[in-house]
Amino acid sequence: MSAVNKVVEFSKYRNKHSRDSKYPLQTEGSFFGKGLTDETMMELSKRFSNPISEMEHRNRCLFLVMSTTGMRAKEVVSLRFSNILKAPSGETLVSYIRKGGKLSYSVISDKVLNSLKEYHSLFDSNSDYFFLSCPGRNRAPRRPLSTRGLQKIVNSWNVLTCLGKKIHPHSLRHSLAQKLMDTGGGHFCSRVLNHSSPAITSKFYLRPYADPNRYLNWNQD
């Protein structure tokens, strides 16, 4: 293949040059590429759009919560209905303890809340937790979903990240973060992720390049 037609994948190029101290990499964008593509996110959204079984309803709710809040796995499985609040400005919030032991809030859309109610309407349960285990063949009682259980569920969705790695719960946080960084900017993304500062968010998710062609229209060809 000629040099003109040979295009190296960005991730391979970056990994190769990360070992070259002569040309140190930018610190920005260290998590760049660890999320899912827009196409994969839309594929998952469509896959979970018409649930029938309890497991399918749970998959839809998990995808909606993780893809709209960017919560970590431990935070997702800790969510409770008793921690749902109404903000003074009208938004529905859920409170939780984030990494570092600090109280935080995330917005829960009507779509997410209605999906959670549909999921819980499938069985007679007084559980306060958003997500529960499924009884399975042994008809074991439902219990609050564990972090390990969440990991297995998300792995079973069987899609790959931008870097070709198998999906895991944090992939959805990366996906949301990259989308918000690109469209809403560092301050907004930082607030949604509950980072301590926008500088931390930029370190992880600011792309190591920018495409000016999105804004330039000098050429009329």
Annotated model-derived regions:
Residues 48-53, 151-191:
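Short, basic (Lys/Arg/His-rich) helix/loop patches that form interaction surfaces
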Residues 6-16:
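Short hydrophobic short-linear motifs embedded
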Residues 78-114:
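Conserved tyrosine-mediated DNA breakage-rejoining catalytic core shared by Y-recombinases
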Residues 15-18, 203-221:
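DNA/chromatin major-groove-contacting recognition/catalytic segments
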Residues 84-86, 164, 185-204:
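Short, polar N-cap/turn motifs at the start of nucleic acid-interacting alpha helices
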